[in-house]
Every structure is written in C-alpha cells, then in structure tokens.
Amino acid sequence: MSRICQITRKKSMKGNSVAHSNHKTRRKFNVNFFSKRFYWVEKDCWIKLNISANGLRTINKIGLDAAIKQASKKGYLIIQ
C-alpha cells in the first residue's frame, strides 16, 4: 500500500534534516496517513479509504459523497 491519500492525493516528500552544525542529511517527511472505514449512504455500503488528516477534514466539510465524486473526477479514486 503506497502512502498516498485517495481524496487529496497528498504523499510524502523529501527534504533535509539539518543539524546544529548545519550538516544536512536527506530525510522523508511522511503524511499524517491512516485507513478508515466510512458508511456510504448513497450506495448503502461500507467503503475503506486510505486518507490523510487533510482528506478527513475535506470529508467532514463537504460530505463523503461530494468528496468521492470530486476525487474520482480528478482521477484520484476509481469507483466501480
């Protein structure tokens, strides 16, 4: 499972870990990512989404159905 949000398409990014001596080493910034089950009322079924915290806020703000339609329109999510 790749760590990419299915709603917002957020993914990890790379950068530098900077020490006090200004010595830089490469590191990875991970997304606040988890998998969560949602009950989709329109389809009358449970779905499991891999989402970030920002994706969860989007679902809370505009609703599950609108968020899924928006993500599938952008090509982030494929619905059967």
From Swiss-Prot:
Keyword presence, RNA-binding: no
InterPro entries associated with the record: Ribosomal_bL28, Ribosomal_bL28/bL31-like_sf, Ribosomal_bL28_bact-type, Ribosomal_bL28_sf
Keyword set includes Thylakoid: no
Organism domain of life: Bacteria
An example molecular function term from Gene Ontology annotations: structural constituent of ribosome
Region (Disordered): 1-21
Protein name per its UniProtKB record: Large ribosomal subunit protein bL28
Native species: Azobacteroides pseudotrichonymphae genomovar. CFP2
